[in-house]
């Protein structure tokens, strides 16, 4: 309406996964910045772009979205029950006046609400609590009651909403679609119902299918190998010939649990060298490490299997001299991805410890989660064996480390409460606070997402070696703890099946 004489054709400019960069460091030409209002913007490195033909390096493609825009303008697709212009006015007014709009609650979204707070939220308001107070009249006591959003892996909240059953005390097996049992394992719905019952009864005793777990473990072959990967994906490629969102495998950690009980941090790999594409070297180093013994290999979730399947495709399309050896290695320890047209039978398939926990073990302290970062602290609370062992320096309990001192103690207390080992990993700036300006003071390597961001930072040319090494050191510690956590979980399962 501002320019009625124009005919506008709308496009989105998107990163095209079918294109590849023909220069190194395309990502460095565009920087994300944040202003004091927590808004993000882009700084274009104009000096760097001056000598580059942007049309030649572009990994972007135009996508015509006329049909989608037409549906919005004609009010075929609506956010609110208003036509397009009135909707824009209403949303603008709501934002400018900081009003609560009061959209109807969608429980699937409420479960994942990004505006929940916890004890570390520094007096921030909880958007979750605000909505439920406004719309459902919940009071402070209601928020303390066990509710349906705590239940693991709920696929639909339709039945809960229809019956207005929001607290665990109000639900029945029917709300879970009925509890369906499966032989020799804890089924999904059985696990959910166990969680509900233990929460209501304030029962913190773990549930274990001991004989079934014992039978499964009897097929495992020592020495036991535990691996964890860290990877990065970016819409703007770091390297020449890399596609947008092409995964970069830059790190792994490898622990071995020997038959005599010795726990060895056997190897690790990390490549944060600016401008060096690490994917194939990553596989070579993993092959070198895992082929030193013939024992069972453990991952935690199917992530490592998926990563190696993607590396397999890259290697198959490469001209590497050891191409066949690397292909055979990957196929020996992985299953084909679900969407793969190829098929092979691994001789030494990786074992998913996440799936083992899911099928045979439930710990109420996890509140339904099977995340390694929830299972490990829960086991610390549950197992006197694990507590006693890891209350000692690692050099006293036959545990080696590549990144922690011999006197490192993994289990510590604060006011009688067990401290989550992951929270003991310090932010990278704590060691170099006065010397590092490139790293945000609020960032720390605390999960895979943070590791991915940290790797992206190492690919900027102006980062000093001091800064790059600080990130590298923190990444190594974090990844080593991940595989050690797997060992601890394995030790616990071994102990409870005696």
Across the structure, where does each feature detected by a protein language model lie?
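DEDD superfamily 3′-5′ metal-dependent exonuclease/proofreading module
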Residues: 1-498
């Amino acid at each position: 309406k501002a320019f009625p004489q124009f005919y506008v054709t709308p496009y989105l400019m998107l990163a095209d996964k079918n294109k590849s960069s023909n220069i190194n460091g395309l990502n460095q030409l565009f920087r994300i910045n944040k202003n004091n209002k927590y808004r993000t913007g882009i700084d274009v490195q104009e000096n760097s772009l001056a000598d580059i033909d942007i049309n030649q390096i572009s990994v972007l493609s135009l996508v015509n979205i006329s049909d989608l825009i037409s549906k919005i303008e004609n009010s075929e697709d609506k956010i609110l029950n208003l036509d397009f212009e009135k909707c824009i006015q209403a949303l603008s007014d709501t934002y400018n006046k900081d009003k609560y709009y009061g959209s109807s609650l969608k429980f699937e979204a409420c479960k994942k609400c990004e505006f929940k707070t916890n004890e570390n939220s520094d007096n921030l308001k909880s958007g979750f609590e605000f909505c439920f107070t406004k719309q459902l009249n919940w009071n402070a006591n209601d928020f303390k009651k066990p509710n349906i959003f705590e239940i693991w892996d709920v696929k639909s909240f339709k039945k809960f909403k229809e019956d207005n059953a929001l607290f665990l005390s109000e639900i029945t097996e029917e709300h879970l679609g009925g509890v369906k049992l499966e032989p020799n394992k804890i089924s999904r719905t059985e696990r959910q119902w166990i969680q509900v019952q233990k929460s209501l009864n304030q029962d913190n005793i773990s549930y274990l299918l001991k004989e079934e777990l014992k039978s499964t473990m009897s097929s495992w072959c020592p020495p036991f190998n535990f691996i964890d990967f860290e990877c990065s994906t970016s819409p703007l490629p770091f390297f020449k010939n890399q596609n947008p969102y092409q995964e970069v495998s830059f790190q792994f950690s490898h622990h071995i649990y020997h038959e005599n009980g010795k726990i060895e941090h056997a190897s690790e790999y990390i490549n944060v060298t600016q401008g060096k594409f690490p994917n194939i070297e990553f596989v070579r180093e993993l092959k070198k490490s895992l082929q030193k013994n013939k024992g069972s290999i453990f991952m935690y979730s199917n992530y490592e299997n998926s990563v190696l399947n993607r590396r397999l495709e890259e290697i198959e399309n490469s001209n590497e001299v050891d191409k066949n050896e690397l292909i055979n290695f990957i196929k020996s320890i992985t299953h084909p991805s679900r969407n793969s047209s190829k098929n092979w039978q691994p001789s030494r398939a990786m074992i998913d410890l996440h799936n083992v926990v899911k099928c045979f073990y439930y710990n109420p302290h996890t509140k339904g989660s099977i995340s390694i970062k929830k299972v490990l602290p829960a086991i610390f609370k549950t197992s006197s064996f694990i507590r006693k062992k890891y209350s000692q320096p690692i050099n006293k309990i036959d545990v080696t480390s590549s990144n922690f001192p011999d006197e490192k103690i993994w289990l510590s207390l604060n006011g009688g409460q067990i401290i989550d080992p992951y929270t003991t990993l310090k932010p990278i700036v704590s060691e170099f606070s006065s010397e590092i300006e490139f790293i945000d003071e609020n960032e720390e390597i605390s999960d895979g997402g943070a590791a991915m961001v940290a790797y992206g930072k190492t690919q900027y040319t102006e980062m000093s070696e001091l800064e790059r090494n600080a990130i590298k050191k923190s990444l190594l510690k974090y990844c080593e703890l991940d595989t050690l956590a797997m060992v601890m979980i394995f030790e616990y399962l071994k102990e409870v099946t005696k």
